[in-house]
Amino acid sequence: MSEILSSVDQRTKLVGENRLELLLFRLGTRHTYAINVFKVKEVITVPKMNMMPGIHGNLRGVTIYRGLTIPVIDLRQAIRMRPVNADNTTIDRNVIITEYNRSVQGFMIGDVVSIVNTSWEDIQPPPKSIGKTNFLTAITQIDIQGKRELVEIIDVEKVLAEIIEYDVTISAEILDQAV
C-alpha cells in the first residue's frame, strides 16, 4: 500500500512542478506516439478478444479485464492509419488500458518504447497546417536511445468521442436555472 501512495505522491508532485509523464509507443512503424500516463491503468499483451455484432469499425473486439468487459480499440485505425492486422505475428502488439470519464477501455498498439517525464514548456500545439481532423493534442521532442525524435501526443478523448456515443441530456430543472 505504501508503494501505491508513493507513486500517487510522485505523480502529484509532477503536476506541481509543471511536468507530465508520457507513455511512448509505436503503432507498427518507427514513428513514436504518446499519451499522458495519468490516464493509463496498465499495459498488457493483446488478450483474447471476442467480436460482437454491430460494433464500431475501430473496435477490435471486447475482452475481460479484471472482471470488467471492456472494448479494445485499434488505435492505428482510429487515427486513420492502416489497422494493425490481427494475424500479423511480426508486430509485438500490446494494449494500453486507460480510464477516461469513468470508462475503462483498451487501445491496441505496437511496441511500448518507454515512459518519460517532460516539462509542459516542451509541449507544443500541433501545426495548424495539418487541419482540424487530426487526432493530435500536442507534439514534443524527446531523446529516445540517444536520438532526438518528434513525438506526437494523441488526443485520446477525441478518438473516444468518435466511437462512444455520449448521451447528453439537460434536466428541466437546470434549464429553468439558466433562464
Give short role names for the model-derived ranges.
Residues 1-179:
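An acidic, low-aromatic, low-complexity terminal/linker signal
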